[in-house]
């Protein structure tokens, strides 16, 4: 199966729920005038096992350590960019161990 590349260039919240990547927009989460139904529709989930590369290109991205762990365990590369949108960091899976 072909893995997907996810690019995030705007402020975003990334978390994990039921082994799925949860993507939320901070503008929607913080807006108190919106209805709960609209807020729920603004939340997108993606299966972790379908993701191959994640590019983080904004300083206002919030990502949990659970997301990082799940992505790396599924051999996903995580790339961070600077203010000029140039890659400055790469996080990838390092060690696989067996407890036999």
Question: What is each of the regions a protein language model found here?
Answer:
Residues 1-53, 57-100:
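N-terminal intrinsically disordered, cationic/polar leader segments
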């Amino acid at each position: 199966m072909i893995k997907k590349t996810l690019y995030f260039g705007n402020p975003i919240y990334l978390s994990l729920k039921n082994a799925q990547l949860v993507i939320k927009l901070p503008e929607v989460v913080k807006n108190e005038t919106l209805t709960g139904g609209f807020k729920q529709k603004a939340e997108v989930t993606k299966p972790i096992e379908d993701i191959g590369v994640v590019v983080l290109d904004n300083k206002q991205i919030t990502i949990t350590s659970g997301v990082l762990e799940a992505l790396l365990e599924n051999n996903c590369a995580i790339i961070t960019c600077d203010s000029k949108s140039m890659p400055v960091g790469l996080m990838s899976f390092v060690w696989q161990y067996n407890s036999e």
